[in-house]
Amino acid sequence: MKPESFDLTIEQMFEFRRMQDATANISQEQALELLVQASRLLMIKSNVIRDLMRQAPLEPLG
């Protein structure tokens, strides 16, 4: 995997900054709830990727 794969796109950087600004003045309780929701979404994303990889046909490269 290329090191650039771990960089954010311009759009992702913009969205990240927008989230930082939007969450700057929330309570600790709200921040914890957002963290729990984000963790759940990351787990779902992992499950979807794993399922898609299982469904993908394996073909030789070249």
Curated annotation (Swiss-Prot):
UniProt cross-references to InterPro entries, sorted A to Z: NblA, NblA_sf
Family per similarity comment: To Synechococcus PCC 7942 NblA and some, to chloroplast ycf18.
Protein name: Phycobilisome degradation protein NblA homolog 1
Domain of life of the organism encoding this protein: Bacteria
One Pfam assignment: NblA
